[in-house]
From Swiss-Prot:
Component of the serine palmitoyltransferase multisubunit enzyme (SPT) that catalyzes the initial and rate-limiting step in sphingolipid biosynthesis by condensing L-serine and activated acyl-CoA (most commonly palmitoyl-CoA) to form long-chain bases. The SPT complex is composed of SPTLC1, SPTLC2 or SPTLC3 and SPTSSA or SPTSSB. Within this complex, the heterodimer consisting of SPTLC1 and SPTLC2/SPTLC3 forms the catalytic core. Within the SPT complex, SPTSSA stimulates the catalytic activity and plays a role in substrate specificity, which depends upon the overall complex composition. GO terms for cellular component: endoplasmic reticulum membrane; serine palmitoyltransferase complex. Pathway: Lipid metabolism; sphingolipid metabolism. It comes from the Eukaryota. Pfam families: SPT_ssu-like. This is Serine palmitoyltransferase small subunit A. Keywords: Endoplasmic reticulum, Lipid metabolism, Membrane, Sphingolipid metabolism, Transmembrane, Transmembrane helix. Signal peptide: none annotated. It comes from Salmo salar (Atlantic salmon). Residues 1-9, 55-68 are cytoplasmic. The gene is sptssa.
Amino acid sequence: MAFEDVWKKISWLYYQYILVTALYMLEPWERAIFNSILISVAGMAVYTGYVFMPQHIMAILQYFEMVQ
């Protein structure tokens, strides 16, 4: 029963994603390309944040003399 509820929620969220981004008008192969590009850009943004955020935080803390 819980699995069905989770599946319904995921299906509902996917349906909302399709409607909000207007992907329902695209062919399946076009939708796959769009989703691939979106996942790639999101992955690069997360990776860049993971790599560079600590350096920026340390620079800010040193600027405000909170860390020596």
